[in-house]
Amino acid sequence: MEHKMNYKKILRGGLIVAFWLVIWTLAARIIDNKLLFVSPLETLKKLVVSVCDGNFWKTVLGSTARIGAGFLFGLIIGLALAVASAKLKLIEELLSPVMKLCAAVPVASFVVILLIWWGSRFLAVSICFLVVLPIVYTNTLEGIKSFDKELLEMATVFRMPLKNRLFYIYLPSLRPFLYSALKVSLGLSWKSGVAAEVIGIPDYSIGEKLYLSKVYLDTAGVFAWTVVVILLSVIFEKIILCLAQRALQWQPICKKPASTKQPKTEGIQLANVNKSYGDNNVLTDLTRTIASGETVILREPSGSGKTTLLRLLAGLEKPDQGTITCGRVGYLFQEDRLIAHISAVKNVALVTGDEAKAREALKQVLDAEDIDKPCEQLSGGMKRRAALVRAVESDCDVLLLDEPFNGLDDESREKVEKYMKERQNGRSMVIASHI
């Protein structure tokens, strides 16, 4: 069936191309002036003659090298500046007028200015760079700003290695923005690059061939070299997008969390902890010691500060007053905070660094056929259990579990309670639960 669909798609595309070739042929016959317009056949003949010319491939390689270099420089520098702007607001503010200027100023103006400054040697490279830079920068920065803050918090709490964050959180979020930037900038780089060559006329360039065709009133030559530009642009785009797709979809083996120099802490100690949001006092003079191996269940109404306390213990928020002593934590957030496009096994292995261990742990609370499904295909209760296993299997001194039984039926809850008791392993455990 799939083969048949592909055949139909190819046939449909071929018919569309044939339709426009017929229109092109009819237009050439109606105009009937080879100085103004030539037919597809005349264009093909000229193209064959050009290909047979010994300088054809030098010309193609010369233009491809210039345009490719400009595109590559724009891509790399655009990505780097977007990351820097996301890190520091001042850089974003400083670069904002520059990027707007690059996007707004006509290419022809840049061409004239750069011709005056540098001549024609690096003109095409510079123009491609100036066209690609703002597109890549803007799209990448927008993608970085769209990162899921909850997933970033999760990665911080579990001390997820940078490599895991890069390939499982950052790049998947950036993927649609980068694809969009690449598709737009690839086409524009060829248009602007060849236009710059037409004006600068560097040796062994398609722009030079187009210019000479114009000078000698060789309309067939103009059409033939235009076809070459279109073909090169399509091939260039296919190659770059294919490489980008492979790079952005690659998922390396999960690394173990980075080792911490933080000394092992016995239990939890809170001394005169105060926390408020505006005029709302959430925690007031809270003093408590929770020993290693001890389990504390917080049964308070909603809004009483249970989640706030857990976030304080996890280091995600700071108390207004008082001190908190707490070791490394494994945190089951109020939300599941699973990476939706990968499996439950991968989600746990990203934290433990051991896929076999993650698989065995998940089998205690999930059916075997569910642990390899993408988390976006799991039910709410299944996601909750997967998130719980991630917290419990993490290398930590303290377990913080916010509503661990939310969305679970009686049978699933019984499995989870048994698993939690078996895997506590002398760690302090704080459970937040509604009354």
Task: Give the label of every model feature segment.
Residues 374-382:
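Conserved ABC ATPase signature
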Residues 314:
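Helix-to-loop junction immediately C-terminal to a conserved catalytic motif
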Residues 126, 130, 163-196, 229:
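Transmembrane alpha-helices
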Residues 156, 356-370:
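Conserved ABC ATPase "signature" region
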Residues 399-403:
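Catalytic Walker B motif of ABC-type/P-loop ATPase nucleotide-binding domains
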Residues 410-412:
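Helix N-cap at the start of a conserved alpha-helix in ABC-type nucleotide-binding domains
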Residues 341-357:
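Q-loop/switch helix immediately C-terminal to the Walker
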